[in-house]
Amino acid sequence: MSDDDAPESLRGAADGPAWRNFYGRRSGKTLRPSQKVYLSEDLGRLRPEGITREENPERRPLDLGALFGGRPVWLEIGFGGGEHMVHMAARNPGIGLIGCEPFVNGVAMLLGKIRAAGVENLLVHPGDVRDLFDVLPEASVSKAFLNYPDPWPKKRHHRRRFVTQGYLGPLARVLAPGATFRVATDIPDYVRQTLEEVPQAGFDLVSESGEAWEDWLSTRYEQKALREGRVPHYMTFRRQG
């Protein structure tokens, strides 16, 4: 599916200022008819207004109290097919969870899972997480997840990884003091870079392990990694302050 075939609410959703490059795919396989229905019927009510530069050129902060009724706010960065995000929302009904994912097919998969699970404490930004960082109030998020991010394996592309200061600085700004940041990856060099870069952004390392968190839901990507002999690694950081 081309960008021109995407619903209006997705076209240009990740566009930021002219200097903000976006790397990675926005769409993949042709969407199933049911997925097109999810996008057309459900995305509009689950997508907060005021995140994109077109909707909010002044970059006014979001009113999270209005969006989530004063509940603690969690953030998932790049939710993939959405299984972990829906699992966390169902397990923690007293929180509000925002997920970011620029890949149209992943957004459609998440919307289907939301319908099936009946969870109501989720919102979706179908675009670049940096646009969301722009408008999240300072110290407003109490937990963030980064699960199996794009590894960008070529050395010349390592600067595109999320665990660089260009992403981690804005993340640190929106996380409250003491907030948790969890990272899961099966790429050894991504582990190395995460352990080097995240503390430089104002985080303390809490744990690193080959054993998953107690509330973890293994994703499709993780199962594929295990079948192919790769070893998952789980890291937990705490925002300083």
Curated annotation (Swiss-Prot):
Family statement drawn from the similarity comment of this UniProt entry: Belongs to the class I-like SAM-binding methyltransferase superfamily. TrmB family.
Source species taxonomy: Bacteria, Pseudomonadati, Pseudomonadota, Alphaproteobacteria, Rhodobacterales
Residues that coordinate or bind S-adenosyl-L-methionine: 76, 101, 128, 150
Catalytic activity as recorded in UniProt: guanosine(46) in tRNA + S-adenosyl-L-methionine = N(7)-methylguanosine(46) in tRNA + S-adenosyl-L-homocysteine
Keywords: Methyltransferase, S-adenosyl-L-methionine, Transferase, tRNA processing
Function of the protein: Catalyzes the formation of N(7)-methylguanine at position 46 (m7G46) in tRNA.
Record Pfam families: Methyltransf_4
Stated name of the protein: tRNA (guanine-N(7)-)-methyltransferase
Annotated active site: 150
Pathway: tRNA modification; N(7)-methylguanine-tRNA biosynthesis
Chain residues that bind substrate: 154, 186, 219-222
Any GO CC annotation of this UniProt entry: tRNA methyltransferase complex
